[in-house]
A protein has these predicted regions:
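Single conserved hydrophobic/aromatic residue that forms the stacking wall/gate
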Residues: 197-207
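Binuclear metal-dependent phosphoesterase catalytic core
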Residues: 6, 15-17, 77-81, 152-156, ...
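Metal-dependent catalytic neighborhoods of phosphoester/phosphodiester hydrolases
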Residues: 16-17, 35, 39-48, 60-69, ...
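Proline-aspartate-enriched helix->loop->beta-strand connector
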Residues: 49, 123, 149, 153, ...
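N-terminal active-site segment of His-dependent metallophosphoesterases
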Residues: 1-44, 119-122
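Conserved catalytic scaffold of divalent metal-dependent phosphoesterases
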Residues: 5-14, 55-144
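Active-site neighborhood of phospho(di)ester-bond hydrolases with catalytic His/Asp-centered motifs
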Residues: 5-7, 29-34, 52-57, 126-129, ...
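Active-site regions of enzymes building and remodeling cell-envelope glycoconjugates
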Residues: 29, 48-52, 67-75, 183-184
């Protein structure tokens, strides 16, 4: 399965200079948050594949104008062609507002998923906006990651953990790829493509 991950900044190549051939072979698009809802609607319409999304900390506008034709996977395990995507959007709470959570609040969200996790026998791809604590995160309150994400990775060993929130312009804080045990960690800032094999085959590929 060829997956296009997006986060935080709209790609001019994909929007202003859209060419269908740039999406050849893409099976599904996944947004990790903080993207214009019109951008997401445009992509799912023009590319003609499902688009899954979680909320970033700046996505309160989705309440008024959600991304049309797209699928919100907040607190859900969405299965597509045998691949299970678990969505947990939002950032560490740093001011009053929506799509922000304390460490305790995010832990509570995860605990409520116990039955879905049991029924689906875990998940393959963890899709979040925020990184995990101590993994690709920042030192400031806003960009501190969630510790419960580390526990999810340790317990369920997903193929991928994909997040946004930490931009390339942040310098040393930006790490595109990492590995934690059996899990590949991806910062999806702007765009990132990976090929996830759904049957025994060579290791997954990245672009």
């Amino acid at each position: 399965m060829k997956i296009l991950f997006l986060a935080d900044e709209e790609s001019k190549m994909y929007w202003e200079y859209f060419k269908k051939e740039d999406f050849k072979g893409i099976d599904i698009i996944v947004s990790c948050g903080d993207l214009n809802p019109s951008y997401l609607s445009f992509l799912t319409t023009m590319v003609g594949v499902p688009l899954l999304y979680v909320h970033g900390n700046h996505d309160d506008k989705y309440n008024v104008k959600p991304p049309e034709g797209c699928i919100c996977i907040e607190d859900e395990i969405y299965e597509y062609e045998g691949v299970r995507f678990l969505g947990l959007g939002g950032s560490n709470r740093y001011k009053p507002g929506e799509n922000q959570y304390t460490q305790k609040e995010m832990t509570k969200r995860v605990k409520k998923l116990w039955w879905k996790l049991k029924r689906k026998n875990g998940f393959d791809v963890l899709v979040t906006h925020s990184p995990a604590k101590g993994l690709h995160d920042g030192e400031d309150t806003c960009h501190t990651g969630f510790d419960v994400f580390n526990r999810l990775i340790e317990q369920y060993k997903p193929r991928y953990f994909v997040h946004g929130h930490v931009h390339m312009s942040y310098g040393r804080q930006f790490i595109r790829l990492d590995k934690v045990g059996e899990t590949t960690v991806i910062n999806a800032y702007e765009k990132y493509i990976c090929l996830l094999y759904t049957s025994p085959s060579p290791r997954d590929a990245h672009e």
